[in-house]
Protein backbone atom coordinates (compact mmCIF):
# COMPACT_ATOMS: atom_id res chain seq x y z
CA UNK A 1 0.00 0.00 0.00
CA UNK A 2 1.41 3.40 -1.06
CA UNK A 3 0.63 6.64 0.77
CA UNK A 4 1.27 10.24 -0.26
CA UNK A 5 3.60 12.56 1.64
CA UNK A 6 0.75 14.52 3.24
CA UNK A 7 -0.74 11.29 4.54
CA UNK A 8 2.56 10.39 6.20
CA UNK A 9 2.58 13.88 7.76
CA UNK A 10 -0.94 13.37 9.13
CA UNK A 11 0.00 9.97 10.58
CA UNK A 12 3.17 11.39 12.15
CA UNK A 13 1.15 14.16 13.83
CA UNK A 14 -1.49 11.67 14.99
CA UNK A 15 1.22 9.44 16.45
CA UNK A 16 2.83 12.39 18.25
CA UNK A 17 -0.40 13.53 19.89
CA UNK A 18 -1.45 9.93 20.52
CA UNK A 19 1.85 9.23 22.27
CA UNK A 20 1.57 12.47 24.25
CA UNK A 21 -1.93 11.67 25.53
CA UNK A 22 -1.19 7.98 26.07
CA UNK A 23 1.86 8.63 28.25
CA UNK A 24 -0.25 10.79 30.56
CA UNK A 25 -3.54 8.92 30.81
CA UNK A 26 -3.64 6.15 28.19
CA UNK A 27 -6.02 6.14 25.23
CA UNK A 28 -3.54 7.19 22.55
CA UNK A 29 -5.07 4.66 20.20
CA UNK A 30 -8.20 6.84 20.10
CA UNK A 31 -6.12 9.22 17.96
CA UNK A 32 -3.66 7.02 16.06
CA UNK A 33 -5.99 4.18 15.01
CA UNK A 34 -8.72 6.41 13.46
CA UNK A 35 -5.94 8.28 11.61
CA UNK A 36 -4.72 5.04 10.04
CA UNK A 37 -8.26 4.10 9.03
CA UNK A 38 -8.88 7.61 7.65
CA UNK A 39 -6.01 7.35 5.13
CA UNK A 40 -7.37 4.05 3.84
CA UNK A 41 -5.41 1.41 5.75
CA UNK A 42 -7.52 -1.80 6.03
CA UNK A 43 -8.82 -2.39 9.61
CA UNK A 44 -6.81 -5.55 10.42
CA UNK A 45 -3.62 -3.96 9.07
CA UNK A 46 -4.40 -0.69 10.89
CA UNK A 47 -4.73 -2.52 14.22
CA UNK A 48 -1.40 -4.30 13.72
CA UNK A 49 0.38 -1.11 12.61
CA UNK A 50 -1.13 0.80 15.53
CA UNK A 51 0.23 -1.81 17.95
CA UNK A 52 3.64 -1.57 16.31
CA UNK A 53 3.98 2.21 16.56
CA UNK A 54 2.29 2.31 19.97
CA UNK A 55 4.85 -0.09 21.41
CA UNK A 56 7.58 2.48 20.77
CA UNK A 57 5.55 5.09 22.63
CA UNK A 58 4.86 2.95 25.68
CA UNK A 59 8.52 1.87 25.77
CA UNK A 60 9.72 5.49 25.61
CA UNK A 61 7.35 6.62 28.37
CA UNK A 62 8.22 3.61 30.54
CA UNK A 63 11.95 4.20 30.09
CA UNK A 64 11.59 7.90 30.93
CA UNK A 65 9.69 7.08 34.13
CA UNK A 66 12.24 4.41 35.09
CA UNK A 67 15.17 6.81 34.53
CA UNK A 68 13.54 9.42 36.81
CA UNK A 69 12.89 6.92 39.62
CA UNK A 70 9.09 6.67 39.34
CA UNK A 71 9.12 2.89 38.86
CA UNK A 72 9.97 0.38 41.59
CA UNK A 73 11.57 -2.37 39.48
CA UNK A 74 11.59 -4.99 42.23
CA UNK A 75 7.91 -4.35 42.99
CA UNK A 76 6.69 -4.39 39.40
CA UNK A 77 8.70 -7.38 38.13
CA UNK A 78 6.02 -9.84 39.25
CA UNK A 79 3.42 -7.76 37.42
CA UNK A 80 5.51 -7.77 34.23
CA UNK A 81 5.81 -11.58 34.31
CA UNK A 82 2.10 -12.21 34.86
CA UNK A 83 1.10 -9.50 32.38
CA UNK A 84 3.32 -11.15 29.77
CA UNK A 85 1.64 -14.51 30.36
CA UNK A 86 -1.85 -12.96 30.33
CA UNK A 87 -1.12 -11.00 27.15
CA UNK A 88 0.20 -14.10 25.40
CA UNK A 89 -2.90 -16.11 26.28
CA UNK A 90 -5.21 -13.23 25.33
CA UNK A 91 -3.57 -12.72 21.94
CA UNK A 92 -3.78 -16.46 21.25
CA UNK A 93 -7.45 -16.68 22.29
CA UNK A 94 -8.20 -13.72 19.99
CA UNK A 95 -7.20 -15.94 17.08
CA UNK A 96 -9.80 -18.51 18.14
CA UNK A 97 -12.91 -16.55 19.18
CA UNK A 98 -14.65 -13.23 18.51
CA UNK A 99 -14.17 -10.38 20.99
CA UNK A 100 -17.33 -8.50 19.96
CA UNK A 101 -19.19 -9.32 23.19
CA UNK A 102 -16.71 -7.10 25.04
CA UNK A 103 -18.06 -4.10 23.10
CA UNK A 104 -21.10 -4.31 25.39
CA UNK A 105 -19.34 -5.07 28.68
CA UNK A 106 -16.38 -2.67 28.64
CA UNK A 107 -18.36 0.62 28.35
CA UNK A 108 -20.32 -0.39 31.48
CA UNK A 109 -17.12 -1.11 33.44
CA UNK A 110 -15.50 2.12 32.26
CA UNK A 111 -18.62 4.10 33.18
CA UNK A 112 -18.49 2.66 36.71
CA UNK A 113 -14.80 3.59 36.90
CA UNK A 114 -15.56 7.12 35.66
CA UNK A 115 -18.25 7.75 38.29
CA UNK A 116 -16.07 6.31 41.06
CA UNK A 117 -13.27 8.72 40.14
CA UNK A 118 -15.63 11.68 39.87
CA UNK A 119 -16.99 11.04 43.37
CA UNK A 120 -13.51 10.36 44.81
CA UNK A 121 -11.85 13.73 44.09
CA UNK A 122 -8.78 13.06 46.25
CA UNK A 123 -8.07 9.61 44.80
CA UNK A 124 -4.38 9.21 44.03
CA UNK A 125 -3.19 12.52 45.47
CA UNK A 126 -1.13 10.71 48.12
CA UNK A 127 -0.11 7.10 48.83
CA UNK A 128 -2.88 5.14 50.58
CA UNK A 129 -3.16 1.85 52.42
CA UNK A 130 -3.12 -1.14 50.09
CA UNK A 131 -6.26 -3.29 50.02
CA UNK A 132 -4.32 -6.32 48.74
CA UNK A 133 -0.79 -7.69 49.01
CA UNK A 134 1.49 -6.62 46.16
CA UNK A 135 2.23 -10.24 45.23
CA UNK A 136 -1.46 -11.10 44.92
CA UNK A 137 -2.29 -7.85 43.16
CA UNK A 138 0.32 -8.18 40.43
CA UNK A 139 -0.41 -11.88 39.91
CA UNK A 140 -4.18 -11.41 39.59
CA UNK A 141 -4.29 -8.12 37.71
CA UNK A 142 -1.28 -9.01 35.58
CA UNK A 143 -3.07 -12.10 34.28
CA UNK A 144 -6.49 -10.44 33.93
CA UNK A 145 -5.45 -7.11 32.38
CA UNK A 146 -2.65 -8.70 30.38
CA UNK A 147 -5.20 -11.12 28.91
CA UNK A 148 -7.65 -8.28 28.28
CA UNK A 149 -5.05 -6.14 26.49
CA UNK A 150 -3.93 -9.03 24.30
CA UNK A 151 -7.53 -10.01 23.55
CA UNK A 152 -9.33 -6.66 23.18
CA UNK A 153 -7.42 -3.63 24.48
CA UNK A 154 -9.46 -0.39 24.79
CA UNK A 155 -9.23 1.14 28.27
CA UNK A 156 -6.39 -1.10 29.50
CA UNK A 157 -4.28 1.84 30.67
CA UNK A 158 -7.24 3.35 32.53
CA UNK A 159 -8.01 0.03 34.24
CA UNK A 160 -4.36 -0.35 35.30
CA UNK A 161 -4.05 3.18 36.68
CA UNK A 162 -7.35 2.89 38.55
CA UNK A 163 -6.40 -0.50 40.05
CA UNK A 164 -2.94 0.70 41.09
CA UNK A 165 -4.41 3.78 42.80
CA UNK A 166 -7.67 2.36 44.15
CA UNK A 167 -6.50 -1.08 45.25
CA UNK A 168 -2.74 -0.96 45.69
CA UNK A 169 -2.80 2.60 47.08
CA UNK A 170 -0.17 4.17 44.81
CA UNK A 171 -0.26 7.91 44.27
CA UNK A 172 -1.32 8.96 40.77
CA UNK A 173 2.06 9.74 39.19
CA UNK A 174 3.63 6.47 40.30
CA UNK A 175 0.52 4.60 39.13
CA UNK A 176 0.82 6.17 35.66
CA UNK A 177 4.51 5.22 35.53
CA UNK A 178 3.82 1.61 36.49
CA UNK A 179 0.94 1.51 34.00
CA UNK A 180 3.29 2.38 31.14
CA UNK A 181 5.66 -0.48 32.00
CA UNK A 182 2.80 -2.98 32.23
CA UNK A 183 1.14 -1.63 29.08
CA UNK A 184 4.37 -2.05 27.15
CA UNK A 185 4.64 -5.64 28.32
CA UNK A 186 1.21 -6.68 27.01
CA UNK A 187 1.63 -4.54 23.87
CA UNK A 188 4.85 -6.25 22.88
CA UNK A 189 3.28 -9.69 23.28
CA UNK A 190 0.28 -8.98 21.05
CA UNK A 191 2.57 -7.15 18.62
CA UNK A 192 4.58 -10.35 18.27
CA UNK A 193 1.42 -12.21 17.25
CA UNK A 194 0.65 -9.59 14.59
CA UNK A 195 4.23 -9.65 13.27
CA UNK A 196 4.06 -13.42 12.88
CA UNK A 197 0.85 -12.88 10.92
CA UNK A 198 2.64 -10.36 8.66
CA UNK A 199 -0.09 -7.74 8.99
CA UNK A 200 1.87 -4.56 9.77
CA UNK A 201 2.85 -1.76 7.35
CA UNK A 202 6.50 -1.30 8.26
CA UNK A 203 7.21 2.08 6.63
CA UNK A 204 4.03 3.62 8.01
CA UNK A 205 4.75 2.07 11.40
CA UNK A 206 8.31 3.42 11.39
CA UNK A 207 7.18 6.98 10.59
CA UNK A 208 4.53 6.84 13.30
CA UNK A 209 7.00 5.28 15.75
CA UNK A 210 9.17 8.42 15.50
CA UNK A 211 6.12 10.55 16.31
CA UNK A 212 5.20 8.22 19.18
CA UNK A 213 8.68 8.43 20.70
CA UNK A 214 8.66 12.24 20.60
CA UNK A 215 5.11 12.54 21.93
CA UNK A 216 5.57 9.95 24.67
CA UNK A 217 8.76 11.57 25.91
CA UNK A 218 7.05 14.98 26.04
CA UNK A 219 3.96 13.58 27.77
CA UNK A 220 5.79 11.50 30.38
CA UNK A 221 8.06 14.46 31.15
CA UNK A 222 4.98 16.63 31.67
CA UNK A 223 3.49 14.08 34.11
CA UNK A 224 6.58 14.35 36.30
CA UNK A 225 6.37 18.16 36.37
CA UNK A 226 2.64 18.83 36.58
CA UNK A 227 0.14 18.70 39.43
CA UNK A 228 -1.59 15.39 40.23
CA UNK A 229 -4.98 17.01 39.58
CA UNK A 230 -3.98 17.58 35.94
CA UNK A 231 -3.16 13.89 35.50
CA UNK A 232 -6.48 12.97 37.10
CA UNK A 233 -8.41 15.29 34.75
CA UNK A 234 -6.63 13.81 31.75
CA UNK A 235 -7.50 10.30 32.95
CA UNK A 236 -11.18 11.26 33.34
CA UNK A 237 -11.17 12.76 29.84
CA UNK A 238 -9.62 9.66 28.27
CA UNK A 239 -12.03 7.30 30.07
CA UNK A 240 -15.01 9.38 28.90
CA UNK A 241 -13.66 9.50 25.33
CA UNK A 242 -13.13 5.73 25.32
CA UNK A 243 -16.71 5.16 26.50
CA UNK A 244 -18.08 7.43 23.76
CA UNK A 245 -15.93 5.74 21.11
CA UNK A 246 -17.10 2.26 22.10
CA UNK A 247 -20.76 3.34 22.29
CA UNK A 248 -20.49 5.02 18.88
CA UNK A 249 -19.08 1.78 17.47
CA UNK A 250 -22.05 -0.14 18.87
CA UNK A 251 -24.59 2.32 17.45
CA UNK A 252 -22.86 2.48 14.06
CA UNK A 253 -22.81 -1.30 13.77
Regions found by a protein language model. Name each.
Residues 48-101, 187-237:
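Selective hydrophobic functional segments
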Residues 38-39, 45, 91, 95, ...:
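Transmembrane helix-loop junction
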Residues 60-70, 99, 107-131, 241-253:
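Transmembrane helix exit motif
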Residues 8, 51, 107-110, 114, ...:
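Residues within membrane-spanning alpha-helices of integral membrane proteins
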Residues 1-42, 127-176, 206:
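Selected transmembrane alpha-helices and immediately adjacent juxtamembrane segments
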Residues 144-154, 190-198, 243-253:
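Hydrophobic alpha-helical transmembrane segments in multi-pass integral membrane proteins
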Residues 41-50, 73-78, 169-180:
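Membrane-interface alpha-helices at helix entry/exit sites of multi-pass transporters
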